[in-house]
């Protein structure tokens, strides 16, 4: 069985371009055969809590870590297992105020965790433990921001994934959703071709 972990971070359940891209991706993934399954984590349905002091103590083995595990720690364990068990990763990420939604940032705060998804191998040296595996980041934005000084989404996602050992994520961008001069049908054809290409490369 080949499993794709798909993480939704759009607050919108309808009219979302990243959810539309995710639907296209899911259809392409399933078209590869019955042995291709998709596991979905929808952060709009279950918003991650912010990391609290007790959870940080458990993450880093600080004083007080012997206290009973928190519900937040249990969520972290679940999400990390899903991440580690997946054969490929896909993130549906709308750009909110030039960066990623806070729900996805909170999810990443729970999965970027010492001794689980990265470890210290020498003074100042760290090693990611969650890769290698293919990763896809599907973005949508009202303007044309990708790879400009206003784009804080792509650099952050690249850094966060690489820190866990997941290098060179593929980005598929549906840009200009608020612009009248950009044809959404043409955009859909372009992203569909790019998503199909990524699936077949996995």
UniProtKB/Swiss-Prot annotation:
Family assignment from sequence similarity: Belongs to the azoreductase type 1 family.
PANTHER family to which the protein is assigned, alphabetical: FMN-DEPENDENT NADH-AZOREDUCTASE 1 (PTHR43741), FMN-DEPENDENT NADH:QUINONE OXIDOREDUCTASE (PTHR43741:SF2)
Free-text remark on how the cofactor is bound: Binds 1 FMN per subunit.
Pfam family, one: Flavodoxin_2
Binding-site residues for FMN, renumbered to this chain: 10, 95-98
Enzyme Commission identifier(s): 1.6.5.-, 1.7.1.17
Subunit structure: Homodimer.
Lineage of source species: Bacteria, Pseudomonadati, Pseudomonadota, Gammaproteobacteria, Chromatiales
Molecular function as annotated in GO: electron transfer activity; FMN binding; oxidoreductase activity, acting on NAD(P)H as acceptor; oxidoreductase activity, acting on NAD(P)H, quinone or similar compound as acceptor
Role, per record: Quinone reductase that provides resistance to thiol-specific stress caused by electrophilic quinones.
InterPro entries for the chain: Flavodoxin_fold, Flavoprotein-like_sf, FMN-dep_NADH:Q_OxRdtase_AzoR1, NADH:quinone_OxRdtase_FMN_depd
Annotated coiled-coil segments of the chain: none
Cofactor(s) this protein cannot do without: FMN
Keywords: Flavoprotein, FMN, NAD, Oxidoreductase
Reactions listed under catalytic activity: 2 a quinone + NADH + H(+) = 2 a 1,4-benzosemiquinone + NAD(+); N,N-dimethyl-1,4-phenylenediamine + anthranilate + 2 NAD(+) = 2-(4-dimethylaminophenyl)diazenylbenzoate + 2 NADH + 2 H(+)
Organism: Alkalilimnicola ehrlichii (strain ATCC BAA-1101 / DSM 17681 / MLHE-1)
Protein name: FMN-dependent NADH:quinone oxidoreductase
């Amino acid at each position: 069985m080949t499993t794709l972990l798909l993480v939704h971070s759009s607050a919108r359940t309808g009219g979302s371009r990243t959810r539309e891209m995710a639907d296209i991706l899911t259809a392409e993934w399933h078209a590869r055969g019955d042995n291709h399954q998709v596991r979905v984590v929808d952060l709009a349905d279950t918003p991650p809590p912010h990391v609290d002091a007790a959870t940080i103590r458990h993450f880093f083995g600080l004083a007080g870590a012997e206290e009973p595990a928190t519900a937040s720690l249990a969520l972290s364990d679940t999400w990390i297992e899903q991440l580690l068990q997946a054969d490929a990763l896909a993130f549906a990420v709308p750009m909110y105020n030039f960066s990623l939604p806070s729900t996805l940032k909170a999810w990443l705060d729970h999965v970027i965790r010492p001794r689980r998804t990265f470890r210290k191998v020498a003074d100042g040296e760290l090693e990611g433990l969650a890769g290698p595996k293919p990763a896809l980041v599907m973005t949508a934005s009202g303007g044309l921001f990708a790879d400009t000084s206003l784009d804080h989404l792509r650099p952050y996602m690249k850094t966060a994934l690489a820190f866990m050992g997941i290098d060179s994520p593929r980005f598929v961008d549906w840009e200009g959703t608020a612009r009248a001069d950009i044809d959404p049908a043409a955009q859909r054809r372009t992203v569909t071709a790019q998503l199909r290409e990524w699936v077949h490369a996995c």
